[in-house]
Design a protein with these regions (language model features):
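Acidic, glycine-rich segments characteristic of secretory precursors and extracytoplasmic regions
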Residues: 21-74, 93, 103, 118, ...
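Conserved, well-structured interaction surfaces
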Residues: 42, 46-59, 81-156, 172-185, ...
Length: 538
């Protein structure tokens, strides 16, 4: 049973306590008697903790719009007369401090921080009778706070640091902290505590096995390993963190190998990973979604164009978020003699060659660009994999039930390979993934250090496409040039003629400081002089 199915009614009853702020500093005071009377029992604390998990629900949308769309994985075309957030993000429009996506991501991530802070401020006043439950719940809250702050630092850089609930006046006097301070004072200590307090089998407040979806020891180790590797790259370049990352990631891999967890054995099983009946089976940590109003995966609606009813009855967003040529070519690189794609991930991630239009008079093949179908459980996909149609259950855009992975074993394996290089274990990590996907293992030439680094990068693109990883990889490697190259590829034809001059403007808009997003305009206006706007947007 999924976490939200188990506690949905309880989480919904928390609405008065956890109503979302429209602004990080626009804090509505909560009735003191209500909060003090509520946080008194382990059962109530568990409901409050589920409220913190509930804050993860919108994050899949930001993984798509703020990571994938910003990267060289996607192609969104050229700006039209109608404003679209994803188009402004993709084109590196410098005037994006006012768009909803940039504002909402800030607010939603700080909402998680706020909920975690409130929980942690109350937990010591509660009498827990079952050993270990209090420490586990604290570990979960701190894991989630670290997760939120990690995204805040990666997206916005300098953000306000707060570890306790704040009044309006306190919030309005809290300036930004440097990114390294956020890492050292919140993210790392929180995850270190989580590593020391979480287990592989979380318990509920009565000591029983919990519903799926809660943070585990392996999740904490994997996230801390990712944090350390991020700190070792641009812009901090703290090389001391690389060995710390290696140790943690190796522990995760060794645990997975010893237990058989988190790994799809073959290509067929890998394809079924993206069916909601297999949620909580393969991913190390994932956002929980169910078929219920406002509890479904919101990114699915945004990730695909409008589709014929034979695939999904619900009218989709119609967004023009396509797979960019570079990634498309990577996934289609290996073909057999008849031209069939060997990489099973192509079929499950972007391949639309079998799609047809909804023309009642004739069947016409879809002629547009490949788009991301990994998270869309359309009728044909489920039928081909042997699952019943769930189309009737998808009442609106908020009902898609497929979980969204925040940490996968394959991500851990490839981060580890990046660190250790072409050692026997590093090569094995890459070859395992390639072998399962149906493409050849690395050649001797590809095991040379420079070539191996490139192979790891390519494998991360193929394996983790549409999962919100790519932009952060580009930033970590200080490789915004890859996005410039993407626009250049679309701007110029085979003869070197400029056919899309607007894209040359986009290239000029990619400045060094655009590895960060702007501080939302709504935040900049709350109190003049409190925050300093990121350099590329001043």
């Amino acid at each position: 049973m999924k976490l939200y199915q188990y506690i949905l009614s309880g989480a919904m009853s928390m609405g008065l306590l956890f109503s979302s702020c429209s602004d990080w500093l626009d804090v509505t005071p909560v009735d003191t008697r209500t909060t003090e009377n509520f946080y008194t029992t382990p059962s109530q604390m568990e409901q409050a903790l589920i409220g913190v998990y509930n804050g993860l629900l919108p994050l899949s949308t930001y993984a798509l719009l703020m990571s994938e769309v910003r990267s060289d994985n996607t192609w969104c075309g050229e700006l039209s007369t109608a404003q679209r957030d994803y188009m402004d993000i993709s084109s590196f429009n410098p005037n994006i401090s006012t768009i909803a996506t940039v504002r909402d991501a800030w607010n939603d991530l700080f909402e998680i921080v706020s909920r975690a802070n409130l929980f942690l401020s109350k937990v010591d006043g509660v009498n827990y009778t079952i050993e270990g439950i209090k420490e586990q719940q604290i570990g979960e809250a701190r894991f989630l706070r670290a997760l939120a702050y990690f995204d805040l630092v990666r997206y916005y850089g300098r953000v306000p640091l707060t570890l306790v609930p704040q009044t309006i006046s306190e919030a309005m006097s809290t300036p930004q902290s440097e990114a390294v301070e956020i890492y050292e004072k919140v993210i790392i200590p929180d995850l270190e505590y989580a590593v020391g307090s979480l287990t592989e089998e979380p318990k509920d407040y009565l000591g029983r096995k919990s519903a799926s979806g809660r943070a585990t020891l392996t999740a904490a180790k994997a996230l801390l390993g990712r944090v350390y590797l991020t700190m070792a790259g641009f812009p901090l370049y703290d090389e001391t963190k690389k060995e710390l990352a290696r140790e943690l990631l190796e522990e995760v891999i060794d645990y997975a190998d010893a237990t058989g967890k988190f790994w799809a054995k073959n290509a067929s099983e890998w394809q079924r990973m993206w069916i909601n009946e297999n949620d909580n089976k393969y991913h190390i940590f994932e956002i929980q979604y169910i078929v219920a109003k406002d509890y479904g995966n919101p990114m699915v609606f945004h990730s695909v164009p409008r589709l014929p009813s034979k695939y999904v009855t619900l009218e989709m967003s119609g967004n023009s978020i396509a797979c960019a040529k570079g990634l498309d070519n990577l996934l289609k690189e290996e073909q057999d003699e008849e031209g069939h794609f060997l990489d099973v991930r192509c079929l499950a991630t972007i391949d639309t060659t079998k799609f047809v239009t909804d023309n009642p008079n004739s069947v016409t093949k879809y002629a547009g660009e490949d788009f991301f179908i990994k998270f869309l459980e359309h009728k044909m996909k489920r039928e081909a994999l042997g699952y019943d149609d769930i189309n009737a259950q998808i009442v609106d855009r908020t009902y898609f039930p497929l979980n969204f992975p925040l940490i996968r074993l394959e991500d851990v394996m490839l981060m580890y390979a990046e660190i250790v290089g072409p050692t026997s274990k590093g090569v094995d990590m890459v070859d395992r993934i390639r072998r399962r996907a149906g493409i050849p293992v690395l050649t001797n030439a590809e095991k040379e250090p420079a070539a191996f680094r490139e192979c790891v990068d390519k494998e991360r693109r193929r394996e983790l496409a549409c999962e919100g990883i790519r932009w952060h990889d580009l930033v970590r490697h200080n490789n915004l040039q890859a996005v410039r190259d993407k626009f250049q590829e679309y701007a110029v034809d085979a003869n070197g003629n400029v056919i899309r001059p607007t894209l040359l403007l986009y290239i000029r808009q990619i400045k060094d400081g655009t590895y960060l997003y702007p501080i939302p305009d709504s935040q900049m206006k709350v109190k003049e002089g409190l925050y300093v706007q990121n350099e590329a947007y001043r």
